[in-house]
């Protein structure tokens, strides 16, 4: 890197860290998940013991506006009355969402900081911590038909069906990744979707070339042959490229897998394009309340996108059912990440028993 650019980058980071000094204790606390500011002079944190409120005299409205401006500058974006919403990543890799007036009440500022896990857990680690202790199988086809109709499936699915039927979810998911099944991880914000996606990505063989597409750098890819591509959310940033442009570029980059980190807005349509382009093995996330509701949420997202607006809802849903192999529903229960449901229905996917 050019020495002047390196120095400029270091100076910008130093300015950001100085501005964040009033909340630095919370940023360093490994027991916290979220740090939120709803109004001046007050910080709320969420950890294993739930929410706590801390009065913070240093965080005046002007001081918070100063933080917003510095974070915008650091992330090569802009925040103003015309552009009152900012999504960025802090120097410590924390994700921050900032909303200023007039998008929030006058004299208030909203800041939501998502802290990344201080370490990456393997799938086995998560299972030993009780990740699957309350997990249920979810499907359209009755579960008691799975083993009795095994011969109607491709051989590659036989081990998966057996593991799924006996709730051996670690083996099931490990095999699913190895077999390049398309996996969708669903849940609300803070439910452990990213933690689980990191564990699954770690199971991808080292000889595969991986391209990730995100709006905020968050995924950890341990494989040596990978490229992390970043798009500008809402057209902000130095380069006004979106997921569509990055996907088109990724398809020319000799990928074995293309991983779109989170599906929302138009990215759901590009997810379909990605899978249909002959690049299975996707591992991605979406906000949904249940595993089956993820199909409806995805249908809605595709329908609302520019590319999917002319498609019929039933056609979109049918396409999603045929493409998505596995849906994992995540939830935080009493401060612990849990998988509450796993959808896997190769019979419905292949329309073996017919029906809608």
Curated annotation (Swiss-Prot):
GO molecular function: ATP binding; ATP hydrolysis activity
Annotated residues for binding of ATP: 187-194
Main subcellular location: membrane
SMART domains the record matches: AAA
Signal peptide start-end: none
One GO biological process term: secretion by the type IV secretion system
Top-level lineage group: Bacteria
Entry keywords, A to Z: ATP-binding, Cell inner membrane, Cell membrane, Membrane, Nucleotide-binding, Transport, Virulence
A Pfam family this chain is assigned to: T2SSE
Entry keyword Ubl conjugation: no
Subcellular localization, as worded in the UniProt entry: Cell inner membrane
Signals that turn on the gene: During the interaction with the intracellular environment of host cells.
UniProt xrefs under PANTHER family: TWITCHING MOTILITY PROTEIN PILT, TYPE IV PILUS RETRACTATION ATPASE PILT
Function in brief: The type IV secretion system VirB/VirD4 is a major virulence determinant for subversion of human endothelial cell (HEC) function. VirB-dependent changes of HEC include massive cytoskeletal rearrangements, a pro-inflammatory activation by nuclear factor NF-kappa-B, inhibition of early and late events of apoptosis, leading to an increased cell survival, and, at high infection doses, a cytostatic or cytotoxic effect, which interferes with a potent VirB-independent mitogenic activity. These changes of HEC require the T4S coupling protein VirD4 and at least one of the effector proteins BepA-G.
Complex formation: Interacts with VirB9.
Protein family (similarity comment): Belongs to the GSP E family.
Name recorded for this polypeptide: Type IV secretion system protein VirB11
Organism: Bartonella henselae (strain ATCC 49882 / DSM 28221 / CCUG 30454 / Houston 1) (Rochalimaea henselae)
């Amino acid at each position: 890197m050019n020495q002047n650019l390196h120095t400029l980058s270091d100076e910008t980071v130093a300015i950001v860290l100085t501005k964040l000094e009033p909340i630095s204790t919370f940023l360093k606390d490994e027991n916290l998940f979220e740090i939120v500011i709803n109004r001046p002079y007050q910080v709320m944190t969420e950890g294993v013991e739930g929410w706590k409120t801390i009065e913070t005299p240093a965080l005046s409205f002007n001081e918070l506006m100063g933080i917003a401006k510095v974070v915008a500058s650091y992330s090569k974006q802009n925040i103003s009355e015309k552009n009152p919403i900012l999504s960025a990543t802090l120097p410590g890799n924390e994700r921050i969402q900032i909303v200023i007036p007039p998008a929030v009440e006058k004299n208030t500022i909203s800041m939501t900081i998502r802290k990344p896990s201080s370490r990456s857990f393997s799938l086995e680690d998560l299972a030993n911590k009780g990740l699957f202790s309350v997990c249920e199988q979810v499907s359209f086809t009755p579960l008691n038909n799975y083993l009795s109709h095994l011969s109607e499936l491709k051989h590659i699915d036989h081990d998966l069906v057996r593991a799924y039927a006996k709730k051996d979810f670690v083996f099931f998911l490990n095999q699913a990744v190895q077999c390049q099944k398309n996996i969708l991880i669903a849940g609300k914000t803070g439910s452990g979707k990213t933690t689980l996606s990191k564990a699954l990505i770690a199971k991808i063989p080292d000889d595969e070339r991986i391209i990730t597409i995100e709006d905020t750098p968050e995924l950890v890819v341990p494989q040596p042959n990978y490229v992390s591509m970043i798009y500008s959310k809402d057209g902000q940033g130095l380069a006004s490229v979106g997921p569509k442009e990055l996907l088109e570029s990724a398809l020319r980059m000799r990928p074995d897998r293309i991983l779109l980190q989170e599906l929302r807005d138009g990215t759901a349509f590009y997810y379909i394009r990605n899978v249909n382009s002959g690049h299975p093995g996707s591992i991605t996330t979406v906000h949904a309340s249940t595993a089956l509701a993820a199909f409806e949420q995805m249908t809605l997202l595709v329908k609302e996108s520019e590319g999917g607006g002319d498609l019929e809802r039933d056609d979109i849903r049918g396409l999603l059912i045929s493409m998505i192999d596995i849906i994992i529903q995540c939830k935080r229960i009493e401060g612990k990440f849990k998988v509450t449901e796993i959808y896997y229905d190769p019979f419905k996917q292949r329309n073996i028993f017919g029906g809608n």
